[in-house]
């Protein structure tokens, strides 16, 4: 994908989340438009730069955009991001997040291990069973 190719080894969840959130804002601004949202190279470049993409990776952006867009000078926004889902996958876990609530997902170093942290808000279900979040009497994880 354009995002993955542009970011290369510096592709991290925070940057991808920032790009998704900015794309989602644009999608919301145009949700009444009958035509799909189209972004030119400069618009996508601005979104990437303001989402925290490093300057050295922005130098790669032009060739990645041209390879993705081909002869076109613009891309449909859905070629850059999926407005219907925000999914985090590891080999053992798949987490689907409301694409408008990516703010609930963060990464954090806990006890020396990189962890995905999801803010729990409202009802929680595990396999269709309503459960409660750990209470305030439980031990909180230490941060390093």
Language model features: what each stretch is:
Residues 1-84:
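Long, hydrophobic alpha/beta structural blocks
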Residues 52-53, 57, 66-67, 72-144:
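C-terminal, beta-strand-rich globular interaction domains
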């Amino acid at each position: 994908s354009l995002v993955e190719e542009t970011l290369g080894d510096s592709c991290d969840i925070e940057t991808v989340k920032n790009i998704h959130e900015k794309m989602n804002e644009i999608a919301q601004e145009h949700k009444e438009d009958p035509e799909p949202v189209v972004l030119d190279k400069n618009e996508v470049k601005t979104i990437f730069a303001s989402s925290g993409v490093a300057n050295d990776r922005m130098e790669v952006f032009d060739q990645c955009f041209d390879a993705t867009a081909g002869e076109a000078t613009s891309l449909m926004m859905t070629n850059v991001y999926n407005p219907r889902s925000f999914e985090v996958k590891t080999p053992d876990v798949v987490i689907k997040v409301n694409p408008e609530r990516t703010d609930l997902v963060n990464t954090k170093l806990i006890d020396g291990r990189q962890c995905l942290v999801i803010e729990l808000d409202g009802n929680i279900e595990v396999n269709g069973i309503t459960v409660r979040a750990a209470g305030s009497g439980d031990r909180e994880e230490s941060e390093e």
